């Protein structure tokens, strides 16, 4: 159904319809309220939903107010009220000025990188505290660390000389574990039984972990591993670091605890 003109009230057909100021007009009826000049969509100006030309467009006028003591008092009172409201809003919203951030893959990558950097810095501070201020105190920890690493890499070498000091009654004690090995007393064949037992003991008795991320060593006493590698002979140093051997490569050293999970 065709609408009525806002000026004359007659029906407006599509060929002569002007849709402007939320109303419908005839092209001839769309003129200035003051001078009756015909307007179009480019040169009209609307005021209270009525068309005006540029010359007769109503202009806002401002009234000058004298700075009387009463007006100054009201102005000062308004400013004080504004400050009080601002302070109330500030105290009310204090501590709430944060926004929820979506957990995107990019943010997860940045978080993972920051965790690695913090772990490296923590490791550096830990090593500096172990080295000590003087040179003599720093040498001993290095020697102890070298001894510890050698003991972790070659657990059998630390205990291998023990069978040579076993008394003559030791072969009798070891024979039931070897399922009736030849009882010939050679002095060198029978001590091999405790050596084999000691090599298998750390692998079965020590803790085993599986890597869940790839990690590249950032220091000489760390080890590199890949996702899915098995870490054996694991010992907990602190909440952030462990000590163990990568079964695939045989390397022994420190590794971050948040990169592995227990098997």
From Swiss-Prot:
Residues covered by the SH3 domain: 204-263
Residue numbers of N-acetylmethionine PTMs: 1
Residues the record lists as N6-acetyllysine modifications: 42
Gene3D superfamilies found in the cross-reference section: Cysteine Rich Protein, SH3 Domains
Post-translational modification: Phosphorylated.
Record GO cellular component, one term: focal adhesion
Molecular-function GO terms, alphabetical: actin filament binding; metal ion binding; monoatomic ion transmembrane transporter activity
Location of region: Disordered: 122-207
Nebulin repeat placement: 64-95, 97-131
Residues modified to N6-methyllysine: 75
Compartment annotation: Cytoplasm, Cell cortex; Cytoplasm, Cytoskeleton
GO biological process: monoatomic ion transport
Summary of subunit composition and partner proteins: Interacts with F-actin. Interacts with ANKRD54. Interacts with KBTBD10.
Listed PANTHER family: LASP (PTHR46218), LIM AND SH3 DOMAIN PROTEIN 1 (PTHR46218:SF2)
Function recorded in the entry: Plays an important role in the regulation of dynamic actin-based, cytoskeletal activities. Agonist-dependent changes in LASP1 phosphorylation may also serve to regulate actin-associated ion transport activities, not only in the parietal cell but also in certain other F-actin-rich secretory epithelial cell types.
Designated name of the protein: LIM and SH3 domain protein 1
Protein source organism: Rattus norvegicus (Rat)
Lineage: Eukaryota, Metazoa, Chordata, Craniata, Vertebrata
């Amino acid at each position: 159904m065709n609408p009525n003109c806002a000026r004359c009230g007659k029906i407006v057909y599509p060929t002569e319809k002007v849709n402007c100021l939320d109303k419908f007009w005839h092209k001839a009826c769309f003129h200035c309220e003051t001078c009756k000049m015909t307007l179009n969509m480019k040169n009209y100006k609307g005021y209270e939903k009525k068309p005006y030309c540029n010359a007769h467009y109503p202009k806002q006028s401002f009234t000058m107010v004298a700075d009387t003591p009463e007006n100054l008092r009201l102005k000062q009172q308004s400013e004080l009220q504004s400050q009080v409201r601002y302070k109330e809003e500030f105290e009310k919203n204090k501590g709430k000025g944060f926004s929820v951030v979506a957990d995107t893959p990019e943010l997860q990558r940045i978080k993972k990188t920051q965790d690695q950097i913090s772990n490296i810095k923590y490791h550096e501070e830990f090593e500096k505290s172990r080295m000590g201020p003087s040179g003599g105190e720093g040498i001993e920890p290095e020697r102890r660390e070298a001894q510890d690493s050698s003991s972790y890499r070659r657990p059998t070498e630390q205990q291998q000389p023990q069978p040579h000091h076993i008394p003559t009654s030791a072969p009798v004690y070891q024979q039931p574990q070897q399922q009736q090995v030849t009882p010939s007393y050679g002095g060198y064949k029978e001590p091999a039984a405790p050596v084999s037992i000691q090599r298998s003991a750390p692998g079965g008795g020590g803790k085993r972990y599986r890597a869940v991320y790839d990690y590249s060593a950032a220091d000489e006493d760390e080890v590199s591993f890949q996702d899915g590698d098995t870490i054996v002979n694991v010992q907990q140093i602190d909440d952030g670091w462990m000590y163990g051997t990568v079964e695939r490569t045989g390397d022994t050293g420190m590794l971050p605890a948040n990169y592995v999970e227990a098997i």
